[in-house]
Amino acid sequence: MSPISAEINPDAVLQFVDVTVRRGSATLLDRINWTVEEDERWAVLGPNGAGKTTLLQIAAAQLHPSAGEVYVLGERLGRVDVFELRPRIGLASSALSERIPGAEVVRDVVVSAGYSVLGRWREAYGRLDVRRAVGLLDRFGVGQFSERTFGTLSQGEKARVQIARALMTDPELLLLDEPAAGMDLGGREDLLRRLTRFADDPGAPASVLVTHHVEELPPGITHALLLRNGAVVAAGLARDVLADEPLSATFGLRLRVERSSGRWFARAVLD
């Protein structure tokens, strides 16, 4: 099935059907049709103001569209209890990170995801929950910070903790909002290596990764969606979409795109 088809797909992990979002006189998303299926790894790219954050908020069941239909894990937004749906969705974003108390212990930041709260819950956490949380922190290279407070971490370290938290509930859909933002080169490459290894796990969920930069995409991305001014420029297989013409149209600049060892790289074409 085409990822831009408006036909309802009952087996889709995520589907937008003619989705529009308006705020006052501004149109943030304009008639978006998009489908994510099982085992797909999507990248969403576009310049600032393209609508990427709005799209991710809807996918995370945190925002309802002004028009159109959204289906998340087989449930239609507006006809489902989002508080029951959200634990099935893993979300890592800088906006969520800003809401976490700085005094919160890193281990508890991750464990509390299983209780749908941001701070330490009133009950004592189970041993198995704590063990799983520490294991996820280890998996993303921040296990040594499990007893530290969240506010003492760097931006990149917080992003890794956010990913561990997003996976705590064993979600069916994983949403990552610019996970490599603010990282130095070494930190970015290490994170992408870990994300690639995670995506290779047979039990890994379908995922959507939002970024401004093709260089921040890990190998294993299968599909891409390009947004500009709230509208879809292109959507489909990554090898077709992450190419010179679609990316140039998306960013309003002539770009040359190359791929090496499963990674994408883009540079401006100088006249």
Indicate residue ranges for each PLM-predicted region.
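Helix-to-loop junction immediately C-terminal to a conserved catalytic motif
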Residues: 60
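Conserved ABC transporter NBD signature motif
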Residues: 68-78
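ABC-family P-loop ATPase nucleotide-binding domains
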Residues: 98-152
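Conserved catalytic motifs of ABC-family nucleotide-binding domains
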Residues: 170
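Catalytic Walker B motif of ABC-type/P-loop ATPase nucleotide-binding domains
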Residues: 174-178
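H-loop (His-switch) and adjacent beta-strand-loop-beta switch element
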Residues: 224-237
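ABC ATPase nucleotide-binding domains
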Residues: 249-271
